Each structure stands twice: as structure tokens, then as C-alpha cells.
Design a protein with these regions (language model features):
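Cyclophilin-like peptidyl-prolyl cis-trans isomerases
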Residues: 1-130
Length: 130
């Protein structure tokens, strides 16, 4: 889904945002899902990967990665990953508006997560494939 999409919003010292199928920030995959904010997953440092949204329950495909701590986003945007090394954060910090995602790859053991969300994933794929 993400391969070939642009980083359509880049704000220095704040974040980079991508995942819009239209490339300008107004698109979605055709479905929305609820927030899954947790006090254990916070925006307390650079490199937090979170869902971009337009308010509660409006998550779709857009995401952002922070350049710095952004505590004011806690409870408003679901954190679902993080940049794990300084070298990777340097890549995030070098991304400019309009840069294209060449390939998105999920690393690590995700089979239990995918199994627990199988019904939702099936529904989302039906929308994407329609």
C-alpha cells in the first residue's frame, strides 16, 4: 500500500507525515478505525511512529514520525512503533517534503498481532481491493 506514496508533510523539528494515497494529505484508504492510545506508548522522544488523524476515530493510512519529543500528542495519536537507532533517525531527519517511500517493510514477529486482527484486516483488504 505505502510503496510509491510521498511524504506530503514535513515540518522541521516536529515530524514527517506520509501515507496519503493522493499525495497531499486529504486521502484515506476508504476505511477508518478507532484510536488505540496507551499510557505506555507516548511521544516522549524523537522517532515515534504514530497514526495521523483528523480527530478521534479517524485513523486510516496516514502516519507520522517525530523529529523530537511531542508530548502534547499523547492521547490524541496512536503510537505503534519507533525508530530504533540513531542512524535510522538520521534517515528520518533527512526526509524532505515530496520524497517517495520506496518500500515499507514490517520487521519482527507479527504473526500473533496479525492473527488477533484477522477479521479487521480482511474487512480493510476487501475495501482496498474493491
Amino acid at each position: 500500500y505505502y510503496n510509491g506514496l510521498k511524504f506530503h508533510r514535513v515540518i522541521p523539528d516536529f515530524m514527517i507525515q506520509g501515507g496519503c494515497p493522493n499525495g497531499v494529505g486529504n486521502g484515506s484508504p476508504g476505511y477508518r478505525f478507532e484510536d488505540e492510545c496507551s499510557p505506555k506508548a507516548r511521544h516522549g522522544k524523537a522517532g515515534m511512529l504514530s497514526m495521523a488523524n483528523a480527530g478521534p476515530g479517524t485513523n486510516g493510512s496516514q502516519f507520522f514520525i517525530t523529529h523530537t519529543a511531542t508530548d502534547w500528542l499523547d492521547g490524541k495519536h496512536t503510537v505503534f512503533g519507533e525508530v530504533v537507532s540513531d542512524a535510522d533517525q538520521a534517515v528520518v531527519d533527512a526526509i524532505r517534503q515530496g520524497d517517495v517511500i520506496q518500500s515499507a517493510v514490517v520487521e519482527g514477529e507479527v504473526s500473533a498481532l496479525l492473527a488477533s486482527q484477522a477479521e479487521r484486516i480482511s474487512q480493510w483488504n476487501a475495501i482496498l481491493n474493491a
